[in-house]
Amino acid sequence: MKLILLLPVLLLLSVSTYAEVCKTITPINTDPYLAEIGTRKVTFVTLDLNTGNCQVINQAGLKQRHGPYSTFKIPHTLITLETGAVKSVDERFEWDQVKHPAKAFWPETWKQSHTLASAFKHSAVWYYQDLVPRIDPKQYKKWLAKFHYGNQTFTPGSDMFWLDNELKISPEEQVAFIKCLVKTRCGVKASNIAAFESAALQETMNSVSLYAKTGAGSIDPNNNDGAFEGWYVGYLKDKTGKPTAAFAIYMEAESFASLKNYRKELSLKLLGDLGFM
């Protein structure tokens, strides 16, 4: 009986402690951005890693979970390196056109061989799908739990669980995961963090380095010409290599084209206006 009573308490403490991502939450004045945001629905959160304070757009959306799509390449890359599924970020896979026939929406950059690093950069889904048989389902379960990654739900052997809304995560949880990663490494070896960052570095501006990943999918999985949802998730480091901010933007728009570039553009504009860049 004591064990039965104790476990829920421990679980509650674990979840509540991890959920305390922000010391304070301050709404961002969206007036300067409304004209360009237009009909898009936006949830944004940035966490100041020095103060623990958050600034947000649409606080009500912070805890709403959505499929991570290709933002899952952040934890997936780390899991891949930790489990030895590849020897390094430079390990190359050949594109199997029979196993992964090109679809109409595929960019040309997917239709070729890739390394883990280039697959991350170009968001080549097939490479990460080919990693699934190399990673024991017990390892996925272990690392999703270590990362407190959303609902931690997946079907063993599935190479679509991060794309078909089985696995879900909220903007708040995305930022909590990034915070864990850059503050305590979340159980990941320092060498694997460094290898990941070599692939995840997007750009350096004004001595600030940006590490991030996009993700997107159609709201109706049977209609790629309709409304889309998308992410841009990552963190910033200053010129000394110290992490300064973690952020996540979730966006819904009338089409993929409407959010393809804008999710990053708006994120960088907000981070700049808030003094992080």
PLM features per residue range, with description:
Residues 82-99, 188-192:
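Short, well-structured active-site flanking segments
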Residues 20-34, 65, 133-138, 182-277:
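Structured C-terminal helix/loop/strand segments within mature extracytoplasmic catalytic/sensor domains
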Residues 2-8:
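Sec-dependent signal peptide recognition
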Residues 14-16:
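N-terminal signal peptide c-region/cleavage motif recognized by signal peptidases
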